[in-house]
Amino acid sequence: MGCAVSTARDKEAIERSKNIDRALRAEGERAASEVKLLLLGAGESGKSTIVKQMKIIHDTGYSQEECEEYRRVVFSNTVQSLMVIIRAMGRLKIEFADPSRTDIARQFFTHASAADEGILLPEIVLLMKKLWADGGVQQSFARSREYQLNDSAGYYLNSLDRIAQPNYIPTQQDVLRTRVKTTGIIETHFSCKQLHFKLFDVGGQRSERKKWIHCFEGVTAIIFCVALSGYDLVLAEDEEMNRMIESLKLFDSICNSKWFVETSIILFLNKKDLFEEKIKRSPLTICFPEYTGTNTFEEAANYIRMKFENLNKRKDQKEIYTHLTCATDTNNVKFVFDAVTDVIIKNNLKQIGLF
């Protein structure tokens, strides 16, 4: 009798042990398939646009209702951009090509200030179209590197006829180009190639950086965004500091940090489309006086790439995976993120000895 009881207890113990093993294995597999990505970079480097692309590429995208919610942001971005361009004319000593536009500008500011932000009234649109067509305004816009202007300004102002329609609903591209400063930490979840991603987007402005520490533990990889087009611009929060130099300093501190000794670093040299246009008229020596190469896209972009990759002090241990990106181009981001996912899978297999 005692032998039978003992055998039953042994079976129960063995079954309990198997259940624990199964639970541990399942937890291990779940942990192995969970990827934490920290999205870092200086302000206005395109991080939030990358997050929006993940929703478009790996989720259901933006529903019609969600797009409608962005209408106010599109209107606000468009109106504010034109205000900034016209205000800059005074500082740049640029006159309106048509003197009558001075009064139109005054009317525009009066109407825009009185109107509810995020509403585009027909009378404001009419004034905006006249101002945007003015040669002086276009001259000020062409010199936007000399002041702070959203990258999306030209895109929205050139689309005034479309976005002013009464039944206007922002497109996915319109949503991608909206600009709202990120404060705090935005967490986004999505799946790709059997991996479950948690993407953390943190505020890029200097005042936000002290909050990053909460995301550090257990991060699989860092995506560091740099605006290639920022080489001839200064920071919004410090007009003495060149944006590219600030990005280099920040990358140096992240790449060589004790927190990230084992962490893969993926470098997105972003806004390649803006850089390709800008490098034709604005030399790289503005940022790097020692540069002796040509002001062509390939040579200038490679030089910037080298400047970042050379900051890596652990080349024997840590590889920097660099990609040229255009965050507003969904196909480009999809292609690049596929490559990023493959790197993460390879590194995961290495860690468990299968690669």
Swiss-Prot record:
Q: Does the keyword Metal-binding apply?
A: yes
Lipid tethering residues (N-myristoyl glycine): G2
UniProt domain G-alpha: residue ranges: 33-355
| Claim: Cell membrane is one of the keywords in the record | yes
UniProtKB keywords: Cell membrane, Differentiation, GTP-binding, Lipoprotein, Magnesium, Membrane, Metal-binding, Myristate, Nucleotide-binding, Palmitate, Transducer
This protein's source sits in the domain of life called Eukaryota
Q: Which GO terms describe its molecular function?
A: DNA binding; G protein-coupled receptor binding; G-protein beta/gamma-subunit complex binding; GTP binding; GTPase activity; metal ion binding
Record region (G1 motif): 36-49
Q: Where is this region: G2 motif?
A: 174-182
The record ties this protein, via SUPFAM superfamilies, to: P-loop containing nucleoside triphosphate hydrolases, Transducin (alpha subunit), insertion domain
Q: Which residues bind GTP?
A: 41-48, 176-182, 201-205, 270-273, 327
Q: Which GO terms describe its cellular component?
A: apical cortex; apical plasma membrane; cell cortex; cytoplasm; heterotrimeric G-protein complex; plasma membrane
* Span list, region G5 motif: 325-330
Q: What is its main location?
A: membrane
Q: Which PANTHER family match?
A: G PROTEIN ALPHA I SUBUNIT, GTP-BINDING PROTEIN ALPHA SUBUNIT
Q: Which family does it belong to?
A: Belongs to the G-alpha family. G(i/o/t/z) subfamily.
How is this protein organized at the quaternary level? Answer: G proteins are composed of 3 units; alpha, beta and gamma. The alpha chain contains the guanine nucleotide binding site. Interacts (via GDP- or GTP-bound forms) with loco (via GoLoco and RGS domains). Interacts with raps/pins.
| Record protein name field | G protein alpha i subunit
